[in-house]
Amino acid sequence: MLYRLDAAAAAVGRAFGARAGDDPWAGGHVAPGQFAPVITAGREFIAGPRPAGRTLETRMIPRLWGVPPPPSVPDARPVLTVRNLQSPFWIGNLRNSEFRCLIPATAFMEWGKPSPKDGKRRQCWFACADQPVFAMAAVWKDSEVPGFALLACEANAALRAEGRDTMPVILPPDAAARDVWLHGGWDRAQALVQPYSSSLMAVRRLPED
């Protein structure tokens, strides 16, 4: 999977009510192992005591796409997605809202079914017709280089038509849903982990027919 965020940091920050600060993002695609804008309402680093008497602001900061795997999995690649919400590796981060974050995007790519012309698999870029810049649900882990992983859920009809079983969790286009993910209890936040309506998605296949 890849995704794109075709908007500069300042514009994304305004759209999500987040302080962009010195984020250098100017727009483009994001691949695993690259830094990308992340919107969080928690601390930048969890080590140390929580600041007393101060409300933490929603802000956008660069973080690495990919979380170091558990120590019990030697020589494994970084983990890019969260699929098992009950996994001991993830449950603490999911229940603690400080570790939940939003990943802004304008489209994401999955490999689709082979082209009828040449039999080669095509890139399928999925966008949301009802929100030009959307938020994908994610969590981050506090490590030497803090990284994030996207939450995955069952694929909707548009993704299943291309042979996919899962898709990233896309939040509805309203501030209330984003607030629940960033601040709410896990019982409320977990209810957002569901497929986005395929009727609200557009797909572009490359190369085109």
Functional labels for PLM-detected ranges:
Residues 1-209:
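Short linear sequence motif anchored by a di-proline
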